[in-house]
Swiss-Prot record:
Family assignment from sequence similarity: Belongs to the universal ribosomal protein uL3 family.
UniProt keywords, alphabetically: Ribonucleoprotein, Ribosomal protein, RNA-binding, rRNA-binding
Protein name per its UniProtKB record: Large ribosomal subunit protein uL3
Signal peptide: none
Organism of derivation: Thermosipho africanus (strain TCF52B)
Length: 205
């Protein structure tokens, strides 16, 4: 199991074998192993890795970083692994752990669009545009008065749109630039430019 944390840089294209491949560029790492969790101590196997230097940390976290022998880090994420013994505290993780052609799963956070109506959020058709209609962008009926006299849970209604955790499975690494810590991944990646992304070896690859 390989993993790394990065930030989305943007999209471009790469020419390979006379084909144009749309790619997303991710600036990933370097990351450091901050903590190891085992079944004996925590009930499950995982490692915690850190990314990006932090300016200020509280005393308890300062102790955690000191124990791992790394500088204070801003972003900490946990990844489940089968054998935490394969990793050492303070170990550096860079993009060279991956190779071109590897299949990876990428997790990001979709663009937040705020409070949105049913037409934008769910793609509802809306009401009639003319002939005396006044419900142009409303969602329509949400239930009945007498039975069941309530709105069912999960009903598609207006609300917060976007800013959700999204995972893209089996993306392919097209190119790796070890010197600049860059990974070019085939296709799109969730989130805005500069958004945080988590990369791991594909589970179903």
């Amino acid at each position: 199991m390989k993993m790394i944390i990065g930030r989305k840089v943007g999209m471009t294209r790469i020419f390979k074998d006379d084909k144009v491949i749309p790619v997303t560029v991710i600036k990933a790492g370097p990351c450091y192993v901050v903590q190891k969790k085992t079944i004996d101590t925590d009930g499950y196997n995982a490692i915690q890795i850190g990314f990006e230097e932090a300016k200020k940390v509280n005393k308890p976290m300062e102790g955690v970083f000191k124990k791992a022998g790394v500088k204070p880090l801003k972003i900490l994420k946990e990844f489940r692994v089968e054998n935490p013994e394969e990793f050492e505290l303070g170990q550096e993780i860079k993009v060279d752990i991956f190779a071109e052609g590897d299949k990876i799963d990428i997790t990001g956070w979709s663009k937040g669009r705020g409070f949105a109506g049913a037409m934008k959020r769910w793609g509802f058709r809306g009401g009639p545009k003319s002939h005396g209609a006044k419900f142009h962008r409303e969602l329509g009926s949400v239930g009945q008065h007498s039975e069941p006299a309530r709105i069912f849970k999960g009903k598609k209604m207006p609300g917060q749109y976007g800013n959700e955790r999204v995972t893209i499975l089996n993306s392919e690494i097209v190119k790796i630039d070890v010197e600049n810590n860059l990974i070019a991944v085939k296709g799109g990646v969730p989130g805005a430019r500069g958004g945080l992304v988590l990369i791991r070896t594909a589970k179903r690859g």
